[in-house]
Design a protein with these regions (language model features):
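Conserved beta-strand-loop surface patch within small alpha/beta domains used
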Residues: 1-128, 137-223
C-alpha cells in the first residue's frame, strides 16, 4: 500500500477561471436519454473536443477486462455575459504505472509524478480539469472508491470525472453541483466541440443529441 499515496504537488493558482465566451454555437450537446424529474444543476458545463473524445474512447477500449484511466487537461473558464462556468477538455493523458484490476484503478505516486511532469513540460498553459476511467461490463456509475479518488486527487469544485463502459458503448460525466455536492448516482452528458460541416464522433448509446436555439443547423452533422 506504500505506493498508493496522495500527492499534493505544487501547481499554479488556477482557482480563477479564464474569461472567455462559452462556445455553444460550435458544439453539439449530448444529454442522457433518461433524466431525473428535477434535473441537478452542475457547477460547470463540459465542452470536449472530438480529438479528446476519440483518444479517451480509444484508451478505454485498449483493455476490455481491466479498468484503465488517465487525466483530462484543458481550461477552466467563465463567460461573464452568460454567467456560465465551463470546461474545455482538449487533452487526454493516459496514466502509466497504475494499480488496476477488473473492478478498481489506483493512480500510484509514480503515475502522478509522471503525469504532472508531462503536463508541465508539454502543456504548461493547460490545467488539470479532471480524470477518466473505465468500468468494463459494470455500467456508468461512481463507486465509493471512485468518490474517494475524486475527493482526494481532484478536490477543486470544477474538476470532473468521466466514466466509460467500453462493452456497451456508454459513458458519462460526474460533476459537482453548484452547492458543492457530488451525486454519485447521476451522470451528465457533454458538449461536443465540432467544426463546421464536420460529422459528430460521439457514439455512446446512453446519450442523445439535443438541439436548441443556440445551435445552428449548418454547424453539425450527426451520423
Amino acid at each position: 500500500m506504500d505506493n498508493k499515496i496522495v500527492l499534493h504537488l505544487p501547481q499554479e493558482d488556477d482557482t480563477v477561471p479564464h474569461q472567455t465566451r462559452i462556445p455553444t454555437h460550435h458544439a453539439l450537446q449530448w444529454s442522457p436519454r433518461y433524466t431525473l424529474e428535477e434535473p441537478l444543476k452542475p457547477l460547470v458545463k463540459v465542452f470536449m473536443t472530438q480529438n479528446a473524445y476519440i483518444r479517451a474512447v480509444a484508451h478505454g477500449g485498449s483493455d476490455l477486462d481491466n479498468e484503465v484511466g488517465g487525466w483530462m487537461a484543458g481550461k477552466y473558464c467563465y463567460d461573464q455575459e452568460a454567467q456560465e462556468y465551463f470546461l474545455i477538455i482538449d487533452t487526454i493523458l493516459a496514466a502509466p504505472y497504475t494499480d488496476q484490476g477488473a473492478a478498481h484503478l489506483t493512480f500510484t505516486s509514480d503515475s502522478q509524478i509522471a503525469l504532472f511532469d508531462f503536463l508541465e513540460h508539454y502543456y504548461p498553459e493547460k490545467q488539470l480539469v479532471g480524470w477518466y476511467h473505465t468500468h468494463p461490463r459494470m455500467g456508468v456509475f461512481f463507486s465509493s472508491w471512485d468518490e474517494w479518488l475524486h475527493k482526494n486527487f481532484f478536490p477543486k469544485p470544477w474538476q470532473v470525472a468521466l466514466v466509460i463502459e467500453p462493452h456497451s458503448s456508454t459513458g458519462g460525466f460526474f460533476i459537482r453541483q453548484k452547492n458543492g455536492v457530488l451525486d454519485t448516482r447521476v451522470y451528465f452528458g457533454f458538449h461536443e466541440l465540432i467544426n463546421k460541416n464536420t460529422q459528430s464522433k460521439v457514439f455512446w448509446k446512453n446519450l442523445e443529441p439535443k438541439r436548441d436555439m443556440n445551435t445552428r443547423e449548418t454547424e453539425v452533422l450527426v451520423v
